[in-house]
């Protein structure tokens, strides 16, 4: 599951759990982006903070792991590089790339987007208020769309709530709430 995870929240966790159950996945690997190329004009929390928050959020589920693959690579991070690396490391595994349907709608702007569908099956998770149709020019058979239980939670909403000192309990796991407070993340985000 790829994303900025700034911060990771319960919507991400529910989506990962639902996709794992639907596709009978052995493992869901969360891959926090290193330096997301599409967010160079937006302030993004340090990669190490996003990695640690994702680790805290997923630690209780033995089916979830967190990879540093993009963080340790350095420089701008591209999904194609990550999928190539994962394919090389796991040549016999069937790879599924889980992302938000809103991100999937932009996939034709991603580097080497045609090759992406050869490396993994893409699963787009529709969030409340956003719906992507499979007829959006996406390759047949290479993409699945999934509706998950309605959790109207977004990372940007959490950052904004922290910035105005509103509670974020129950929107993201307790360990992430404490980590955000301890590191004083998102203080100026309102």
From Swiss-Prot:
It catalyses: nicotinate beta-D-ribonucleotide + ATP + H(+) = deamido-NAD(+) + diphosphate. This is Probable nicotinate-nucleotide adenylyltransferase. Pathway: Cofactor biosynthesis; NAD(+) biosynthesis; deamido-NAD(+) from nicotinate D-ribonucleotide: step 1/1. InterPro entries: Cyt_trans-like, NadD/NMNAT, Rossmann-like_a/b/a_fold. Belongs to the NadD family. Keywords: ATP-binding, NAD, Nucleotide-binding, Nucleotidyltransferase, Pyridine nucleotide biosynthesis, Transferase. CDD domains: NMNAT. Its EC number is 2.7.7.18. GO terms for biological process: NAD biosynthetic process. It holds the Pfam family CTP_transf_like. It comes from the Bacteria.
């Amino acid at each position: 599951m790829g994303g900025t995870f700034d911060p990771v929240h319960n919507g991400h966790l529910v989506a990962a759990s639902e996709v794992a159950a639907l596709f009978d996945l052995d493992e869901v690997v969360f891959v926090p982006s290193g330096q997301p190329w599409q967010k160079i004009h937006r302030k993004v929390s340090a990669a190490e903070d996003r990695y640690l928050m994702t680790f805290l959020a997923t630690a209780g589920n033995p089916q979830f792991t967190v990879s540093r693959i993009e963080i340790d690579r350095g420089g701008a991070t591209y999904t194609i590089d990550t999928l190539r690396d994962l394919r090389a490391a796991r040549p016999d595994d069937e790879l599924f790339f889980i992302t938000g349907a809103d991100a999937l709608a932009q996939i034709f702007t991603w580097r080497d987007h045609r090759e992406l569908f050869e490396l993994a099956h893409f699963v787009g998770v529709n969030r409340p208020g956003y719906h992507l149709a499979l007829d959006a020019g996406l390759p047949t058979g290479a993409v699945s769309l999934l509706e998950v239980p309605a959790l109207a939670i977004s990372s940007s909403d959490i950052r904004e709530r922290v910035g105005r000192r509103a509670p974020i309990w129950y929107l993201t796991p307790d360990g992430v709430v404490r980590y955000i407070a301890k590191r004083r993340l998102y203080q100026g985000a309102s």
